[in-house]
């Protein structure tokens, strides 16, 4: 009886972690869309401005996307924002 109870509780933990992963994936995809909307606009908005927008978007939408926005921000600073034509 206790073995069955422990197995069922392990199954519940796995399903909870799967649902958490799915929700974090949906949060990251929506934040990526919001980051793309921040980057939309004319060409060469300036690398620093794009980096700040990406960092703020990452912080506001969740911790899972901060790494991606930091990397994107560093890339924008290095390239000077010259490839920010339209929506990236």
From Swiss-Prot:
User: Please, which domain of life does this record's source organism belong to?
Assistant: Eukaryota
Sequence similarity: Belongs to the hssA/B family.
Q: What is this protein called?
A: HssA/B-like protein 17
Write the gene name.
hssl17
